């Protein structure tokens, strides 16, 4: 790993946003208890972003705190210290970044509802057959009769992911999902991660050419140099 990559990796590891916590605390409903909790949080040099009251009874107040800490170890120490304090119970603690990634950050959704048999006959068989034949007779019709015109394949082999280096296709998926989210959020373009379990240049080129009919564009993402340049140039020449 180069000095630049090592510096970038440390930047990601040390970022306070990477250790933003959601803490659900059950606090005794007594005067001064909220102040005691915030004082404990302050001792750990943590910032409180928000405090939301979830429930109130005569005995306790249930509050959700959104907090940033310096690192993961400090977050664990803070949670442990709060739980030891009389009148405070940590009901749940979660890393907000990980919470956002549970079950993935993107999904495929239908643009047309399928509520009954008639709808099904239009979007699938038998009606879809006529659409297939229209594209068979005129391949350019695929851009107006399918999702292709608005779809991008985000292709990686996981060899040069951000400042993390060669971490493999599975570990690259969260970044590729994030890239797909940017396409959707800022341009309303549907993008999907294609994470390849190969580092072979010829195999990557072959795979991308094989999947190209299903996408309007191909984004080569986080493939290590110098292979990335050869792959890009070859695909520019060999794809339309």
Which sequence ranges carry the predicted segments?
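Metallocofactor- and cofactor-centric catalytic cores in central/energy metabolism, strongly enriched
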Residues: 60-63, 75, 79, 89-239
């Amino acid at each position: 790993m180069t000095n630049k990559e090592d510096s970038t990796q440390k930047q990601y590891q040390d970022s306070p946003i990477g250790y933003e916590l959601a803490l659900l605390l059950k606090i005794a409903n007594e005067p001064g208890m909220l102040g005691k909790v915030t004082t404990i949080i302050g001792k750990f040099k943590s910032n409180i972003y928000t405090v939301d009251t979830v429930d109130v009874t005569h005995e306790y107040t249930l509050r959700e705190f959104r907090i940033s800490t310096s690192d993961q170890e400090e977050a664990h120490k803070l949670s442990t210290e709060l739980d030891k304090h009389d009148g405070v119970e940590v009901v749940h603690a979660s890393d907000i970044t990980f919470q956002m990634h549970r079950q993935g950050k993107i999904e495929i959704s239908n643009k047309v509802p399928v509520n009954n048999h008639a709808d099904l006959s239009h979007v699938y068989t038998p009606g879809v057959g006529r659409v297939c034949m229209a594209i068979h007779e005129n391949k350019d019709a695929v851009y107006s009769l399918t999702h292709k015109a608005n779809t991008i394949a985000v292709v990686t082999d996981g060899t040069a992911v951000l400042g993390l280096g060669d971490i493999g296709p599975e570990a690259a998926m969260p970044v590729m999902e994030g890239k797909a989210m940017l396409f959707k959020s800022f341009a309303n373009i549907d993008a999907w991660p294609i994470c390849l379990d190969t580092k072979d240049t010829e195999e990557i080129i072959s795979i991308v050419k094989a999947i190209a009919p299903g996408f309007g564009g191909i984004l080569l993402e986080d493939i290590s140099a110098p292979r990335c340049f050869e792959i890009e140039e070859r695909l520019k020449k060999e794809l339309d």
